[in-house]
Amino acid sequence: VKTLAVNLALALLIAVSALTVTPTAHADMLVGNYTANTDRDRGHNWLWAVRPCTTRQPGCVTVQSVPQPNGQAAWWQADAHLANGRYTMAVDVPDGVRCVVQFFPSHDVYSWDAVSLSGELVTTYDTGCGGGPGGTDTYPFTLMRW
């Protein structure tokens, strides 16, 4: 009886140890509000409201980006997907190219590290300010949860 009790206790200890040291397959971003810090548009700060995707798929978060101050900047929403430790999302922004009196659309791709919350924004556009040619610009950015 004593041997059986010792064996059961040992088996339970091994099972609990295995559960506590098993790494998770993915690191979902914490739900909450973040400030997106970038030099892309110095006239606005961007607040990100991050929540799970409606599909509840692991490694998927929905980002709703709200400009502060709110005047003359459009909010947007997109899903970000986790792969190889990085989140990536693409969004078409109606006023991504912000000139003095005109705004033009852009296609933006955000990619950031799931742990450090730092990454880059690559923005592609067909028309530049002052009727200039289209192009692609890259900006570093960081996220800070608050």
Residue spans for each PLM region:
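A short linear-motif detector with a strong N-terminal bias
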Residues: 16, 26-30, 117-123
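Central antiparallel beta-sheet cores of small beta-barrel/beta-sandwich binding domains
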Residues: 28-30, 36-105, 131-146
